[in-house]
A protein has these predicted regions:
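Bacterial N-terminal signal peptides that target proteins for export
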Residues: 1-10
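C-terminal motif of bacterial Sec signal peptides marking the signal peptidase cleavage site
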Residues: 19-22
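Bacterial signal peptide processing site
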Residues: 24-26
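Active-site beta->alpha N-cap acidic-glycine motif
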Residues: 60-156, 175
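C-terminal domain-boundary segment and adjacent tail
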Residues: 81-91, 130-131, 251-278
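Structural recognition of the beta-strand scaffold that forms the well-ordered cores
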Residues: 96-99, 121-125, 146-149, 185-188, ...
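CE4/NodB-like, metal-dependent polysaccharide N-deacetylase domain
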Residues: 115-116, 120, 146, 162-195, ...
């Protein structure tokens, strides 16, 4: 009998300890789920940690400061009420701006790069060059890219009539509105070519500015300047030329962008969103 009571007492003690330990169970994921599971939980809150190395960067991009006031563009040489034409933003902030055209859709990894690095890029789209149903444009937007106007047909505007230029600019505004629900405020004239009629048509279509890019005399006008130092406020256009008779570029856009990002970091600069400064 005594042995039976001793067994019962021992079982009761074990049960009491189990209840107490259950009530005092820690909510720390390291104790509750185990160290390996807890590391997975914590990692999910830092999805972009270390991704910069995947894209060939030694360190993540520094966060861009928020502009405290709108830049002063000075006198409007084109006339009152017409949008300014910019190849740089007058700012002392240590930032530059990355802008792209249709080549942003040609490199399938570019969308991943924008999302993982949280690149504040601006992509100018022409209806002629956009993929079916604007699907990739929608993915670019979801990844964080700003979507702006590059006209309907990517046609050189300079020399066209007012009606023709307005149709190109306003027509693409309508397409971006109907397909993506957007109302872009920035226009990039194809090939950087424009005239006073372009400015008037752009103003009538609701454009706030015409955006060019930093050039270098004697170099490829479609490319950003490769030599010389970068300056705060530079508007850059990473660009790669497709191989002859091929739709894919000879150098992936992600490779060219990573090369430029390393140069930006080496210059003590970072990338800011162009729309935040305009």
């Amino acid at each position: 009998v005594r042995a039976r009571w001793a067994v019962r007492a021992l079982l009761a003690g074990v049960l009491a300890l189990a209840v107490l330990s259950g009530c005092a169970q820690s909510v720390d994921p390291i104790e509750r789920l185990g160290k390996k599971a807890a590391q997975k939980v914590r990692a999910s809150h830092e999805p972009h940690r270390g991704k910069y190395r995947r894209w060939g960067l030694a360190a993540p991009l520094a966060p861009a400061p928020r502009p405290v006031r709108s830049p002063d563009y000075g006198e409007d040489p084109a006339g009152a009420g017409l949008p300014p034409v910019l190849d740089h933003v007058p700012t002392r902030d240590k930032v530059v701006f990355l802008t792209y055209g249709a080549d942003a859709e040609r490199d399938p990894r570019f969308i991943d790069m924008v999302r993982e690095l949280r690149l504040p890029v601006s992509v100018f789209l022409a209806d002629r060059a956009v993929g079916p149903g604007y699907a990739r444009a929608a993915r670019l937007r979801a990844a964080g890219a700003g979507i702006e106007n590059l006209t309907v047909g990517h046609t050189e505007l300079r020399g066209l009539s007012y009606a023709e230029q307005r149709a190109e600019i306003c027509g693409q505004q309508e397409r971006l509105r109907s397909r993506l629900g957007l109302h872009p405020r920035l226009l990039r004239p194809p090939y950087g070519a424009y005239d006073r009629t372009t400015l008037q048509a752009a103003a009538d279509c609701g454009m706030a500015a015409l955006i060019l890019w930093r050039r270098m005399p004697g170099r490829d006008p479609e490319s950003y300047e490769r030599g010389g130092p970068l300056h705060p406020g530079d508007i850059l256009r990473p660009h790669v030329q497709p191989r002859e008779e091929e739709s894919r570029p000879s150098v992936p856009l992600t490779t060219e962008t990573a090369r430029l990002l390393r140069r930006i970091q080496a210059s003590g600069l970072t990338v800011a969103r162009l729309e935040d400064y305009l």
